[in-house]
Amino acid sequence: MSPLSAVPAVRRAAVLGSPIAHSLSPVLHAAAYQVLGLRWSYSAIECDEAQLPGVLMSLDESFVGLSLTMPLKRAILPLLDDVSELAVAVGAANTVVFDGLGPFLRRRGENTDVPGIVAAITARRPDGVRNAVILGAGGTAAAALAALRELGVDGTVVVVRDQARAGELRRCADRLGVTPTLVDWPGRAALGEADVIISTVPAGATDQLATQSPAAHGQLFFDVLYDPWPTAFAVASLAAGAAVIGGLELLVQQAARQVELWTGRPAPIEEMRAAGEAAMASRSESS
């Protein structure tokens, strides 16, 4: 590539994961780049952990960055040249920024899930959060724990389905300098006392809680899922008078920060959200 054409005219980005065909990320990013007047493309690439090193090496210089789903958020870390302090603390990078070209290229890992969660909660709880419950102990739970630390939450209870599988979350808590209380599923007593309940568990995992311990008036329920949506717990919580945030809002907020990292420009969040809502409505009509 000659010096006169060192920067490709059309830039590219992609989301990696398996399965990935369901992802709404391409819809959100396409909306953002259209509003910003950029000739950028954003695609979904099927990729599992074993394929990740090969896919990473195959990307040409038109790529500005990547979005990653679990478990790739953790698997990518040893393949990067630089990792932000936040991504190191959380133990996951959902975003890769490509800095430089050719022999000067460096791949930098960032975590935009954490500021995405912070933004989503702050919009609904501008006066702050006293205490919170996280359902689940996986990678997204670690991001939620970091977000709650940034929000100044002193007491966080993590409800886990298997204490033996919560080791990585405990290590994350140590890196963050926080001491959450881990309790066994379903943690109904903790649910009833929380200002905010964040669910990071798979679809269907909270269905039984929907009939027994939904969020109530004065509480905020935040589910990271957007497909399927709404979940039974979200429906029951709304009926009980709770405020509810769906996973689309997290997807929009974390994607907006990816756009800003890659372009250096403010992301058009409203247009991204509208595109995501339209895509979800279309899926609902066709299902």
Where are the predicted features?
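Phosphate/diphosphate ligand-binding glycine-rich loop within oxidoreductases
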Residues: S2-R125
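Short, conserved loop/helix-junction motifs that constitute active-site signature segments
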Residues: A6-V7, G128, E150-G152, T211-Q219
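Glycine-rich adenosine-cofactor-binding loop
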Residues: G17, N111-V114, I121, R125-V153, ...
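Helix N-cap at the beta1-alpha1 junction of Rossmann-like dinucleotide-binding domains, i.e.
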Residues: I20, Q163-A164, P228
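Conserved S-adenosyl-L-methionine
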Residues: E150-G155, A239-A243
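NAD(P)-binding Rossmann-fold cofactor-contacting core
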Residues: V153-L176
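Rossmann-like adenosine-cofactor binding region
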Residues: L176-V244
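Adenosine-phosphate binding glycine-rich loop
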Residues: V224-S287
